[in-house]
From Swiss-Prot:
Belongs to the RuBisCO large chain family. Type I subfamily. This is Ribulose bisphosphate carboxylase large chain. Induction: Expressed under both copper-replete and copper-limited growth conditions. It catalyses: 2 (2R)-3-phosphoglycerate + 2 H(+) = D-ribulose 1,5-bisphosphate + CO2 + H2O; D-ribulose 1,5-bisphosphate + O2 = 2-phosphoglycolate + (2R)-3-phosphoglycerate + 2 H(+). Mg(2+) binds at residues 194, 196-197. Binds 1 Mg(2+) ion per subunit. GO terms for biological process: reductive pentose-phosphate cycle. Substrate binds at residues 116, 166, 170, 288, 320, 372. GO terms for molecular function: magnesium ion binding; monooxygenase activity; ribulose-bisphosphate carboxylase activity. The modification N6-carboxylysine is found at residue 194. It is an enzyme of class 4 (lyase).
Length: 473
């Protein structure tokens, strides 16, 4: 056995953390970063610096390295690839031994991968593009409280996407008027209504009063329609104790689903709430408020596909994913990629959709993809074509903005959805025949006809800021 010796001083990171001959183990956590190095910093040195700072390294040699098996615990930069069309950037692939991370802790994984390293002077820009979680680590995480199939069984809804609506205006309504809007939307044909991300417990509408009026609306709509209904009661709160207090009250009054803002609320709170929901039979809707602060810049931050994986591990039955066709950012191919990462059990590397690694989820349940943001009845054919059945389509303004009121807006969306599902089941091409399908359905639905007339000119044709880098080995 070789004798370890300590030589004080500073040495280049690549001497220890660059290992192009390394073959990743099945149990390694793999990450790919898009790096923009400072001028004059070699690619291998920049990649090794990221591997060091996100694992065992520091800026100088330390004698305590001799007290551990550094060769086992260190992260290894093992491959570098060009970013298509970007001479100053490259992809760095890094392997981390699984023992660097606390079991079942998304918090700990994020603290390592995107902690101090993002302020490193050796790089001008750093973006975490994708992560491969080994199955051995996936199995230590709780994941979604219930998942897609259990939710369908709870809500008794099969063979189609679910329909929702975010109540607007998002702020300022009294609890009673808020409950009235919920009732009208649910009675009109929606499956769910929703608190917006910043509806918590403000002076104009305290949380307990909102919960009570909303539950009254749900029970009334269920009695009149014979369908199971729900409303995402946002339990995000200033403290974990207050969050659980609100969750317990939602359970007490019979609500089927609650909601959490998982980024602003934090992964620690989210994982705890997901565990509580699993133990108490409550569904959990997840909003991604604040995500674009970190994922929209193509040169620095965290890609949203990483957030989808982190959320699936931390726990949630629904996650907002963008719409492709609405008002929010979302490249079509990249969106299709992270939808699969949320819902499927096994996903293969597919650079055309931005997926850098194979990902196995084992028996972990899937998550409903939620399409929300600037959508209306004209988008229904494209939404069904893009998302398929295991999704929630949430029309906020596209319901409440109907010229005849909330119930009519809900009815228009329900008719449009059922017409598109029937057409798809008959083998028709939704995105090519969408106008014809909706026009035919509107002949027997004045609510749909009015909605189509109202929003016939509304489009959101802005170019995507975060374009997909199509890279091949």
């Amino acid at each position: 056995m070789a004798v370890k010796t300590y030589n004080a001083g500073v040495k280049e990171y690549r001497e220890t953390y660059w290992d192009p001959n390394y073959t990743p183990a099945d149990t390694d956590l793999l990450a790919v970063f898009k790096i923009t190095p400072q001028p004059g910093v070699p690619r291998e040195e920049a990649a090794a610096a990221v591997a060091a700072e996100s694992s065992t390294g520091t800026w100088t040699t330390v004698w305590t390295d001799l007290l551990t098996d550094l060769d086992y615990y260190k992260g290894r930069a093992y491959r570098i690839e060009d970013v298509p069309g970007q001479d100053e950037q490259f992809y760095a692939f890094i392997a981390y031994p699984i023992d660097l991370f606390e079991e079942g802790s998304v918090v700990n994984v994020f603290t390592s991968l995107v902690g101090n390293v993002f302020g490193f002077k050796a790089v001008r820009g750093l973006r975490l593009e994708d992560v491969r979680f080994p199955l051995a680590y996936v199995m230590t995480c709780g994941g979604p409280p219930h998942g897609i199939q259990v939710e369908r069984d709870i809500m008794n809804k099969y063979g189609r996407p679910l329909l929702g609506c975010t109540i607007k205006p998002k702020l300022g309504l009294s609890a009673k008027n808020y409950g009235r809007a919920v009732y009208e939307c649910l009675r009109g044909g929606l499956d769910f209504t929703k608190d917006d991300e910043n509806v918590n417990s403000q002076p104009f509408m305290r949380w307990r009063q909102r919960f009570d009026f909303v539950m009254e609306a749900i029970e009334k709509a269920e009695a009149e329609t014979g369908e199971r209904k729900g409303h995402y009661l946002n339990v995000t709160a200033p403290t974990p104790e207050e969050m659980y207090k609100r969750a317990e009250y939602a359970k007490e009054i019979g609500a089927p689903i609650i909601m959490h803002d998982f980024i602003t609320g934090g992964f620690c709170a989210n994982t705890g709430l997901a565990n509580w929901c699993r133990n108490n039979g409550m569904l959990l809707h997840i909003h991604r408020a604040m995500h674009a602060v970190m994922d929209r810049n193509p040169n620095h931050g965290i890609h949203f596909r990483v957030f989808t994986k982190m959320l699936r591990l931390s726990g949630g039955d629904h996650l907002h994913t963008g719409t492709v066709v609405g008002k929010l950012e979302g490249d079509r191919q990249a969106t299709l990629g992270w939808i699969d990462l949320l819902r499927e059990r096994s996903i293969k590397e597919d650079r055309s959709r931005g997926i850098f690694f194979d990902q196995e989820w084992g028996a972990m349940p899937g998550v409903f993809a939620v399409a929300s943001g600037g959508i209306h009845v004209w988008h229904m054919p494209a939404l069904l074509s893009i998302f398929g059945d295991d999704a929630v389509f949430q029309f906020g303004g596209g319901t409440l903005g109907h010229p005849w009121g909330n119930a009519a807006g809900a009815a228009a969306n329900r008719v449009a959805l059922e017409a598109c599902v029937e057409a798809r089941n008959e083998g028709r091409q939704l995105e090519k025949e969408g106008k014809e399908i909706l026009t035919e359905a509107a002949k027997s639905s004045p609510e749909l006809k009015a909605a189509m007339e109202t929003w016939k000119e509304i489009k959101f044709e802005f170019d995507t800021v975060d374009k997909l880098d199509v890279a091949h080995r």
